[in-house]
Amino acid sequence: MALKLIHKEFLELARDPQPHCSAGPVWDDMLHWQATITRPNDSSYLGGVFFLKFPSDYLFKPPKIKFTNGIYHQR
């Protein structure tokens, strides 16, 4: 079930890419994705690379996200 949903979401991203970011599976593992924020230039997340690991029961449980660079937080 999770793979079917993730594949559907991947096809939607390919069909209608979102501005200022990219995302997709790492190699052929649909449960492991990499996402990158490319703009806007004044964003504290510019150039951010994120890895997402989807659980096999995705939709009922959220993906785990790993940030490879610092994340701005106001506190």
From Swiss-Prot:
- Which SUPFAM superfamilies does the annotation name? UBC-like
Q: Sorted alphabetically, which InterPro entries does this protein's record hold?
A: UBQ-conjugat_E2_core, UBQ-conjugating_enzyme/RWD
Q: Which domain of life is it from?
A: Eukaryota
Q: Where does the record place the UBC core domain?
A: 1-75
Coiled coil ranges: none
The entry sums up its family as follows: Belongs to the ubiquitin-conjugating enzyme family.
Under what name is this protein listed?
A: Putative ubiquitin-conjugating enzyme E2 D2-like protein
